[in-house]
Amino acid sequence: VTMPITGPVARNWADTDIITRTQRLGLNVSTTTNTAQIRQTIVYFSRNTSFDLLTGFNMAENATDTAIRFFIGISANIVFTNVEPNTLLNCVGICRLSTSNNLHIVYNDNTGIGTTIDLGSNFPANTISTDKYLLKIKAVSTGIYIKLERVGTAFSYETTLTSDIPSTSTGLNFGAYIVDTSGPNTTTGFDWYGSYIMTNN
């Protein structure tokens, strides 16, 4: 599956802290309203085929800014633009809304505004290269299971989503994006740790 990346930047390894010890790829963008993103050009799994996704990330450049939009997870998108993550259709993932400093779970079916769960101050989205997150999204018989872990802490959140989610036959893929929605041009980014997706076709 082709995976175009917009705004890649190398991150150096160093035995300094939980972030620098992680093999990771930075994605950033220096122009306001433009997106840095990683995406897949086709959809290739669904709830019917079953899927099990594991990925990881941390917020990086300009995370203290108050107008950032961020999403990482599964969706039917093959390209991302400067939109609030809760307007994405057929998605399940983790996001930062431009109105919040916390991470949220976001999910939506093929219509309307998505549902969000504010994970609160124990899951900050406005820290720069300090908080490491692991994300698991999995199709289960009753819906879609999602778990976010803040590595090195006691904080994790997990739930099974049963409504306002993609249908069993909707084609999906993996993707992530970040955008600074307003203000002067400032480099804004996140780090991606790679993804593992297992499907049972």
Label every model-predicted segment:
Residues 1-23:
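Extracellular glycan-recognition surfaces and repeat-rich motifs
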Residues 164-201:
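Ligand-recognition surfaces built from glycine- and aromatic
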